[in-house]
Amino acid sequence: MTAPAIHPSAVIESGARIGDGARIGPFCHVGPEVVLGADCELISHVVLAGRTTIGPRTRIFPFASIGHQPQDLKYRGEASTLTIGADCLIREGVTMNPGTSGGGLETLVGDHCTFLANSHVGHDCRVGAHVIFSNNVMLAGHCSVGDYAILGGGAAVIQFARVGAHAFVGGLSGLENDCIPYGMVLGNRAYLSGLNIIGLQRRGFAREDIHALRRAYRLLFAPEGTLMERVEDVAATFESHAAVAEILDFIRLGGKRSICTPREVPTPISAA
């Protein structure tokens, strides 16, 4: 075991629990209810507040503010938590807030996540593992983001929206509906522009699985019938395919937002 290395200018309040091998740089402030895991690093000027728990080997860069009270006007000081997983990278100016009584009193971030400069995780959010937030991504309260999702620079996600696993939200997109797993959304307001094929290839999905997802996508968003009717048709066609089932379960589960769909192609206007 290696004792924590704490710069003399850092303020570690009584009650804070600092793991073995942690490194806390100049002018950091760690609150009394913070739990900082083993081998974490706070480079400098990092603030950890509230009932915040951070997993081992997470690195946090200057001017990140983690665990201060939620940005929710209904918040009345109720005890709530923020839990961040292991091996995360949190860059300059990132903010993350704990939960509220309106959302389960906890905000959760999984392992191996990357949050680039000035990105934000709002109160009561659920962020999976291996998620990437590019610079200036804004995740409003009560949102969920699935494993391996990527949010491009400047993307904004409205309260209560869901982003499925392996999805891609394009830079500067404004997402006000739910993005299916493996989907790709673009624009303001964002529309479903297809599947995240490049992401699937990079993560080693088999060609036959990608082909099945493409076929299922075309059937799901065909013009005939209702979405739920098409869900059942796709379920019957791909009854043993796990990735397709994940999309269907996501749609069936539903949420407070609608499912993001492809943009309609305008009907050509006749010159006659």
UniProtKB/Swiss-Prot annotation:
The keyword Transmembrane helix does not apply. Its EC number is 2.3.1.129. GO terms for molecular function: acyl-[acyl-carrier-protein]-UDP-N-acetylglucosamine O-acyltransferase activity. It is found in: Cytoplasm. CDD domains: LbH_UDP-GlcNAc_AT. Pathway: Glycolipid biosynthesis; lipid IV(A) biosynthesis; lipid IV(A) from (3R)-3-hydroxytetradecanoyl-[acyl-carrier-protein] and UDP-N-acetyl-alpha-D-glucosamine: step 1/6. It catalyses: a (3R)-hydroxyacyl-[ACP] + UDP-N-acetyl-alpha-D-glucosamine = a UDP-3-O-[(3R)-3-hydroxyacyl]-N-acetyl-alpha-D-glucosamine + holo-[ACP]. GO terms for biological process: lipid A biosynthetic process. The keyword Transferase applies. One of its GO terms (cellular component) is membrane. Involved in the biosynthesis of lipid A, a phosphorylated glycolipid that anchors the lipopolysaccharide to the outer membrane of the cell. HAMAP family: LpxA. Homotrimer. Belongs to the transferase hexapeptide repeat family. LpxA subfamily. This is Acyl-[acyl-carrier-protein]--UDP-N-acetylglucosamine O-acyltransferase.
